[in-house]
């Protein structure tokens, strides 16, 4: 993506500031703006002292001491910004020329490369059952079969069970045989009820 910005509507500085670089007044005025005189490029102590002594104490501000070492700060600022009569400020100190006119037209290009790889595979399984069990009415409740239970007194003399499915008719109505047949009948009925329910 390329973005071009036209800054003609922004307040521009007249190119007359850049025309007289050699004079000390111009370099002093341009010290806080875009311009910077070439005489301050050499980062030696003599040039730094000359630069600081040429400014009044009222004009010396935080921008003149960007680091704890004033000489290092001066060297950084003087090498970072260089101008000539027809050039604007170049961040890489290249000699890009700009026409001398009262209206500046700068073009800024932004290069934006964005690569996004999204893997959005969503495996979802939703099972909705809309079958609702019907509430059993009281009549259905009454129609349920009541299976015989083997009570605690099932081995009494009154509890007589038919032994028609027995292998032989021996040992008729003994208490163990009664319990066995009652249990076997109960298991048959439970199995039949399960088959019907399924």
From Swiss-Prot:
Cellular component GO terms, alphabetical: host cell cytoplasm
Organism: Rotavirus A (strain RVA/Monkey/United States/RRV/1975/G3P5B[3]) (RV-A)
Cofactor: Mg(2+)
Binding residue positions for Mg(2+): 92
Positions carrying Phosphoserine: 67, 154, 156, 164, 166
Subunit note: Homodimer. Interacts with VP1. Interacts with VP2. Interacts with NSP2; this interaction leads to up-regulation of NSP5 hyperphosphorylation and formation of virus factories. Interacts with NSP6. Interacts with host DCP1A, DCP1B, DDX6, EDC4, EIF2S1, AGO2 and CAPRIN1; these interactions are probably part of the sequestration of some host SGs and PBs proteins in viral factories.
Key word Glycoprotein present: yes
A GO biological process held by the record: viral genome replication
Pfam families: Rota_NS26 (PF01525)
Keyword set includes RNA-binding: yes
A molecular-function term among this protein's GO annotations: ATP hydrolysis activity
Keyword vocabulary terms for this entry: Glycoprotein, Host cytoplasm, Host-virus interaction, Magnesium, Metal-binding, Nucleotide-binding, Phosphoprotein, RNA-binding
Family membership: Belongs to the rotavirus NSP5 family.
Disordered, as annotated region: 16-37, 53-72, 85-104
Function: Plays an essential role in the viral genome replication. Participates, together with NSP2, in the formation of viral factories (viroplasms), which are large inclusions in the host cytoplasm where replication intermediates are assembled and viral RNA replication takes place. Orchestrates the recruitment of viroplasmic proteins such as capsid proteins to these factories. Participates in the selective exclusion of host proteins from stress granules (SG) and P bodies (PB). Also participates in the sequestration of these remodeled organelles in viral factories.
The name this protein goes by in its record: Non-structural protein 5
Biased composition (Low complexity): 16-30
Entry comment on modification after translation: O-glycosylated. Hyperphosphorylated on serine residues, when in dimeric form. Phosphorylation by host CK1 is required for the hyperphosphorylation of NSP5 dimer.
Compositionally biased tracts (Polar residues): 91-104
Localization of this protein: Host cytoplasm
């Amino acid at each position: 993506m390329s973005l071009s910005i036209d800054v003609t509507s922004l307040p521009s500085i007249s190119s007359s500031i850049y025309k007289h670089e050699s004079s000390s007044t111009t370099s002093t005025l341009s010290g806080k703006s875009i311009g910077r005189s070439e005489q301050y490029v050499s980062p030696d102590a003599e040039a730094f002292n000359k630069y600081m002594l040429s400014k009044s104490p009222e004009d010396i501000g935080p921008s003149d001491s960007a680091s704890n070492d004033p000489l290092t700060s001066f060297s950084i600022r003087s090498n970072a910004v260089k101008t000539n009569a027809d050039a604007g400020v170049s961040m890489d100190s290249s000699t890009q020329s700009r026409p001398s006119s009262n209206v500046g037209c700068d073009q800024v290009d932004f290069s934006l490369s964005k690569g996004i790889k999204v893997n959005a595979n969503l495996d979802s399984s939703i099972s909705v059952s809309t079958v609702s069990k019907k509430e059993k009415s009281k009549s259905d409740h009454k129609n349920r079969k009541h299976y015989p239970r083997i009570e605690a007194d099932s081995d009494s003399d009154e509890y007589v069970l038919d032994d028609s499915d027995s292998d032989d008719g021996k040992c008729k109505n003994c208490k163990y045989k009664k319990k066995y047949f009652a249990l076997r009948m109960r298991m048959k009925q439970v199995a039949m009820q399960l088959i019907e329910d399924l």
